[in-house]
Amino acid sequence: MQDNEIFEKVQDIVAEQLGIEKKIVTREANFSSDLGADSLDTVELVMAIEEKFSIEIPDEDAEKISNLSQVVDFIKSKLNTISV
């Protein structure tokens, strides 16, 4: 799966979960300070991403992820591990 494809899927999830316009969900937008996500929103985002990509994001990794770029990198690494 390509970088842009992952980004677009995650962008859709974030926009839908947070009820915001897709165009403001950029790669560098911080979930809490830029997009207004609270801790519950973050948990729901992680769950939706896990479901969409059939991966597991451990809590300690989820706590380190603050923007879409980091999510995309994490998903790519997980998918590469699965496919090897």
Swiss-Prot record:
Pathway: Lipid metabolism; fatty acid biosynthesis. 4'-phosphopantetheine is transferred from CoA to a specific serine of apo-ACP by AcpS. This modification is essential for activity because fatty acids are bound in thioester linkage to the sulfhydryl of the prosthetic group. This is Acyl carrier protein. HAMAP family: Acyl_carrier. GO terms for molecular function: acyl binding; acyl carrier activity. Residues 4-79 form the Carrier domain. It is found in: Plastid, Chloroplast. Gene3D superfamilies: ACP-like. One of its GO terms (cellular component) is cytosol. InterPro entries: ACP, ACP-like_sf, PP-bd_ACP, Ppantetheine_attach_site. Keywords: Chloroplast, Fatty acid biosynthesis, Fatty acid metabolism, Lipid biosynthesis, Lipid metabolism, Phosphopantetheine, Phosphoprotein, Plastid. One of its GO terms (biological process) is lipid A biosynthetic process. SUPFAM superfamilies: ACP-like. It comes from Pyropia yezoensis. Pfam families: PP-binding (PF00550). Its main location: plastid. Belongs to the acyl carrier protein (ACP) family.
